[in-house]
């Protein structure tokens, strides 16, 4: 059960703002010193660990063997604003997230995600598709030599966080699966459970708890032979949704509390 209080707000909000401000300033300093983008992402990973510790949120991960070391699209069900810190903690590569353009206007936070190269999602579907396609093309061309971090394009295919207390997923947007097919990028499905209990949609105070991340077996566009590009993207969409839904069911069965 969620327990929000003035005491929690007075403790959490200043701490979060301090961490975000410090991280942003450190990253800007790294840019001045011409640090590599990989080193800057390392800074973001460290910041994420501090944030999770501050909020008393634990991340439990299974299926790490399914996190392939090649450019890919990560698809996860969207439960909470904690999904991004959870993935940054789980995925040690260079994760590029999509964020609504409004988030880039938030003081301190917006500048921070811009520096990290987060992708601006527009209300115009055609413009968003073009931006995502360019991002997919960019990570596909990344050379993984000299210990470079593996790039992943992280997308929440529902497009918005769920409000359903039973974690029922919303409709998946097909556009990203067309992009996966176009650029022949594998999809790594991740099922996530627990974020909604820490901070539901619309809330900005956090309860302590655990987020369970289950990395599932990747799906490869080239495995769908003998069908049109449109049919291939539809099959990829349906199979990704089923895989995440099945994984989510397993997490709920293993970790939900009675009542």
Features from the language model and the residues they span:
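Membrane-anchoring hydrophobic helices of lipid-metabolizing enzymes
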Residues: 1-72, 85
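Non-catalytic C-terminal accessory region of glycerolipid acyltransferases
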Residues: 2, 6, 133-259
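Catalytic core of membrane glycerolipid acyltransferases/transacylases, capturing the structured
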Residues: 22-30, 70-126
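Hydrophobic alpha-helical segments of integral membrane proteins
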Residues: 43-51, 55, 109-112, 135, ...
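Residue-level detector of anion-binding/catalytic polar loops
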Residues: 58, 119, 186
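Generic structural signal for helix capping and beta-alpha/helix-loop junctions
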Residues: 69, 105-107, 130, 163, ...
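Structural motif
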Residues: 125-134
């Amino acid at each position: 059960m969620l327990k929000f209080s003035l005491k929690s707000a007075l403790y959490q909000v200043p701490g979060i703002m301090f961490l975000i401000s410090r991280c942003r300033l450190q990253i800007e300093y790294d840019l001045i010193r011409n640090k590599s983008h990989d080193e800057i992402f390392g800074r973001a990973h460290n910041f994420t660990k501090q944030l999770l510790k501050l909020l008393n949120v634990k991340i439990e991960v299974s299926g790490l063997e399914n996190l392939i070391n090649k450019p890919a699209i990560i698809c996860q069900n969207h439960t909470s604003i904690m999904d991004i810190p959870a993935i940054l903690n789980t995925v040690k590569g260079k994760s590029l997230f999509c964020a609504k353009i409004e988030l880039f206007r938030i003081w301190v936070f917006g500048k921070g995600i811009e520096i990290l190269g987060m992708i601006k999602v527009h209300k115009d579907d055609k413009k968003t598709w073009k931006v995502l396609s360019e991002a997919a093309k960019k990570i596909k061309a990344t050379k993984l030599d000299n210990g470079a971090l593996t790039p992943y394009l992280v997308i929440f295919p529902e497009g918005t966080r769920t409000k359903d207390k039973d974690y029922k997923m919303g409709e998946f947007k097909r556009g990203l699966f067309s992009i996966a097919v176009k650029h022949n990028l594998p999809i790594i499905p991740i099922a996530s459970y627990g974020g909604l209990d820490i901070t539901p949609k619309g809330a900005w105070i956090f309860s302590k708890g655990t987020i369970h991340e289950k990395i599932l077996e990747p799906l490869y566009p080239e495995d769908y032979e003998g069908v049109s590009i449109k049919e291939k993207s539809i099959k990829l969409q349906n199979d990704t949704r089923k895989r995440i839904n099945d994984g989510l069911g397993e997490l709920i069965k293993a970790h939900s509390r009675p009542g």
